[in-house]
């Protein structure tokens, strides 16, 4: 007997081509057995045609050499994932994009990229008249390189665990206006999982001739425009222009869009952003903090232009000499004069020991398009209100502050530090936060600089989630495990790894183990990063 999906297709074709009066007459005059036989034959015919077209699409995909990974593995939820050495969130996004676009090219389906509603995803548009061809080539692609498909509009996620090579995974495709393809990917340690909240969305655009000039109409609004001229010119555009999470490297391959979508988005940052990392503790745990900070930048902020390591001690031997990293020797307290760093961009992220990025971030998360900073608000209590930096900030600006600033990566403008010095602000004592017995309040330099920028209109404090933990915290392992499972915090800050309580209580070792698990993929800044030689599986 034909499978239910084929029977449903047969019924659809039967209802489409046989008028309702004829069907009503047949229901009363033709025996039920004959009707079942006719419908069954139609279902078998459609099933054979679908299988033939699927094999043809699969041959196209295989000739194009699509779908390569080192090996396959099983994700914790039972789905199939692909293993890639050196995996990053941005690399996974580009792999997904290249897979889909090359498959559409192999099937000779015209497409163009459009700004997605969510920056985490990329979106492609095809005409609705190519919907049948698109389904066949994408189903073949998902068989060659196992992935999953769901309907986005209308929403139907009940197929998220069904491999896209199965025809039942496409049961909502007929009425879908937007679909999403996802591939689960992981690194060889299977500690980093990517793909669940990413994927490639495909919109089906319709031709409209209501006006003298034919237009293409999108199935949903986007961040630029929903209708474009059918004869609009196609242009190449970098993926970083469509998603703020993408690498800004100009050597990476572009995508294709229409000239109508080549506009500056509201949240698009056009200026370069550097990162400044402080190296202060030449100890094993100090090296692990630096290594984790570099990995977090490499993994979650590929748009960072140059990384500057301000070394107040002998730099680790494993730091890789590269055009994207600069190591500068400095004396303690030099962070007050970071604006004097050679070749430092006007805008930069300052990451002190223990400051980490916890998930993918955009430049817009830390800076405004006009060049202002977006520091994180922190706790405010009686002891904080009497801190030395509060009095110093008031003496410089003449304005009282009403909140502190959270620990973690800090957005800075070099000219703010310059103007702060010109205003006569004195350099406050900077504590070594890794030897403090508890979680400190606002860092004096952050409080001074952010308040000064806020008063001048160059800072706009925000409230994104951040977590600060002391290594001597009782039961810290539970907190670390929760962070490892959820991976939903934008920025992290660890304190007290150099205290005796953290060392004797196992907190320092627990944090180091957590860093190894949270950031398993080596960065390009490490010369001792392991290399894995594996034969790629071309039929995964």
Swiss-Prot record:
Signal peptide: none annotated. One of its GO terms (biological process) is polysaccharide biosynthetic process. One of its GO terms (molecular function) is transferase activity, transferring phosphorus-containing groups. Transmembrane segments: none annotated. Its EC number is 2.7.-.-. InterPro entries: Stealth, Stealth_CR2. It is an enzyme of class 2 (transferase). Keywords: Exopolysaccharide synthesis, Transferase. Stealth proteins are part of a protein family that is conserved from bacteria to higher eukaryotes. Family members were first identified in microbes as proteins that help pathogens to elude the host innate immune system. Microbial stealth proteins are involved in the biosynthesis of exopolysaccharides. Stealth proteins are predicted to function as hexose-1-phosphoryltransferases. Belongs to the stealth family. PANTHER family: N-ACETYLGLUCOSAMINE-1-PHOSPHOTRANSFERASE SUBUNITS ALPHA_BETA (PTHR24045:SF0), PTHR24045. This is Exopolysaccharide phosphotransferase SCO6022. It comes from Streptomyces coelicolor (strain ATCC BAA-471 / A3(2) / M145).
């Amino acid at each position: 007997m034909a499978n239910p999906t084929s029977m449903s297709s047969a019924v659809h074709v039967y209802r489409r081509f046989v008028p309702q009066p004829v069907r009503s007459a047949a229901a009363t005059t033709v025996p039920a057995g004959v009707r079942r036989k006719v419908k069954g034959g139609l279902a078998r015919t459609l099933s054979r045609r679908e299988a033939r077209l699927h094999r043809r699409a699969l041959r196209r995909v295989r000739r194009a050499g699509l779908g390569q990974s080192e090996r396959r593995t099983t994700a914790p939820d039972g789905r199939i994932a692909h293993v890639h050495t050196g995996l990053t969130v941005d690399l996974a996004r580009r792999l997904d994009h290249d897979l889909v676009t090359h498959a559409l090219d192999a099937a000779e389906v015209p497409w163009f990229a459009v700004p997605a509603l969510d920056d985490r995803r990329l979106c492609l548009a095809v005409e609705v008249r190519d919907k049948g061809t698109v389904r066949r080539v994408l189903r073949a692609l998902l068989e060659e390189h196992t992935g999953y498909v769901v309907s986005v509009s209308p929403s139907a996620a009940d197929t998220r665990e069904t491999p896209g090579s199965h025809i039942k995974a496409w049961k909502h495709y007929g009425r879908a206006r937007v679909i999403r393809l996802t591939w689960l990917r992981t690194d060889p340690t299977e500690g980093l999982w990517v793909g669940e909240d990413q994927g490639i969305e495909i919109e089906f655009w319709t031709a409209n001739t209501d006006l003298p000039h034919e237009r293409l109409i999108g199935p949903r609004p986007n961040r630029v425009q929903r209708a474009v001229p059918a004869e609009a010119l196609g242009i190449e555009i970098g993926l970083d222009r469509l998603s703020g999470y993408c690498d800004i490297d100009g050597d990476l391959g572009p995508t294709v869009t229409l000239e109508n979508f080549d506009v500056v988005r509201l949240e698009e940052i056009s200026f370069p952003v550097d990162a400044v990392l402080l190296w202060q503790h030449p100890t094993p745990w100090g090296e692990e903090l630096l290594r984790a900070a570099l990995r977090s930048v490499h993994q979650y902020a590929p748009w960072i232009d140059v990384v500057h390591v301000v070394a107040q001690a002998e730099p680790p031997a494993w730091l890789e000499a590269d055009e994207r990293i600069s190591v500068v020797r400095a004396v303690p307290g030099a962070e007050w004069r970071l604006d004097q760093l050679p070749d430092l961009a006007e805008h930069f992220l300052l990451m002190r020991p223990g400051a980490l990025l916890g998930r993918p971030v955009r430049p817009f998360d830390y800076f405004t398009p006009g060049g202002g900073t977006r520091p994180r608000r922190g706790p405010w209590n009686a002891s904080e209100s009497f801190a030395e930096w509060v009095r110093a900030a008031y003496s410089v600006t003449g304005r009282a502050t009403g909140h502190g600033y959270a620990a973690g990566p800090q957005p800075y403008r070099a000219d703010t530090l310059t103007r702060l010095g010109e205003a006569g602000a004195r350099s406050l004592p900077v504590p070594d936060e890794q030897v403090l017995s508890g979680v400190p309040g606002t860092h004096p330099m952050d409080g001074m600089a952010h308040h000064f920028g806020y008063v001048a209109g160059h800072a706009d404090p925000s409230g994104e989630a951040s977590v600060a933990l002391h290594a001597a915290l009782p039961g810290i392992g539970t907190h670390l495990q929760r962070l490892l499972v959820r991976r939903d915090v934008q920025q992290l800050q660890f304190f007290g790894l150099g205290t005796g309580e953290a060392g004797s209580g196992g907190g320092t070792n627990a944090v180091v183990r957590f860093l190894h698990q949270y950031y398993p993929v080596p960065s390009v800044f490490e010369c001792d990063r392991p290399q894995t030689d594996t034969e790629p599986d071309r039929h995964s």
